[in-house]
From Swiss-Prot:
This is Type III pantothenate kinase. SUPFAM superfamilies: Actin-like ATPase domain. One of its GO terms (cellular component) is cytoplasm. It holds the Pfam family Pan_kinase.
Length: 246
């Protein structure tokens, strides 16, 4: 068994990787002050893994704390996965492959593992990232925008003037709070739709839309094309990397 850990900006997710399958284990908030305690609470009872594979976008401190905890708990190698020029059938579009966020890289690998065809991968988390993968496994690049929470934080001063953001039944709203919510939501939806349209023109086919991340369920009802929810796409990619290891 190998232990897979995805350290995101907001959440840490983990899973067990075994030949032919992986099992989601749980999640907790990315908080460096209590990271070791959260790991101990959720993972201490696991049998000793052969190795620990980590995707980390939350900074060096979080990664170091996790590695120190895992090494002390089991005395096992801790491997931090890095973006590569190509791996497992996927070709990185970035001239400097290491500059592509490892979460996006593993999302591409996870998507290719589950569906070997063109797809548009939307990760709706702290940031909203959209990456295009063609039918040959080539990454065509991506776009990055603010996530829903980031937009709310940026508009906090307007909320103070007009009340806290709240849902709006339609697109146009007659109070500041709902108008903010509508604008935030449809800014994200608009970027996804524009990305889909441009992807279809570039590839001359309609790529499947894969949706992952903490805000995936919020955005899904507003997307007009068929959507496939993939809750733990980074862990899917980590599992593929784990299976490649000797």
């Amino acid at each position: 068994m190998k232990l897979l850990i995805d350290i995101g900006n907001s959440r840490v997710k983990w899973a067990r990787s075994e030949p032919g399958r992986y099992t989601f284990g749980g999640a907790f908030a990315t908080d460096a002050s209590s990271l070791a305690e959260a790991c101990e609470s959720q993972m201490a009872a696991l049998p000793r893994p052969e190795a620990v594979l980590v995707s980390n976008v939350a900074g060096m401190r979080a990664g170091r704390l996790l590695a120190d905890w895992a090494s002390a708990r089991w005395v096992v190698p801790v491997r931090f996965v890095r973006s590569e020029a190509s791996a497992l059938g996927v070709v990185n579009a970035y001239p400097n492959p290491a500059q592509l966020g490892v979460d996006r890289w593993l999302g591409l690998i996870g998507a290719w593992r589950t569906r070997r065809d063109a797809c548009c991968i939307v990760s709706a988390g702290t940031a909203l990232t959209i990456d295009l993968l063609d039918a040959e496994g080539r990454h065509r690049g991506g776009v990055i925008g603010p996530g829903l929470a980031m937009m709310r934080a940026a508009l906090a001063s307007l909320e103070a003037l007009g009340g806290a953001a709240e849902s709006c039944d339609g697109f146009f709203c007659n109070r500041t709070g709902p108008a903010l919510s509508s604008g935030i939501l449809h800014s994200a939806v608009g970027l996804i739709r524009e990305s889909q349209a441009r992807a279809a023109r570039l590839l001359a086919t309609e790529p499947e839309l894969l949706l992952t991340g903490g805000d995936a369920e919020t955005l899904r009802p507003y997307l007009e094309t068929p959507v496939r929810l993939v809750p733990h796409l980074v862990l899917e990619g980590l599992h593929a990397v784990a299976e490649r290891m000797p």
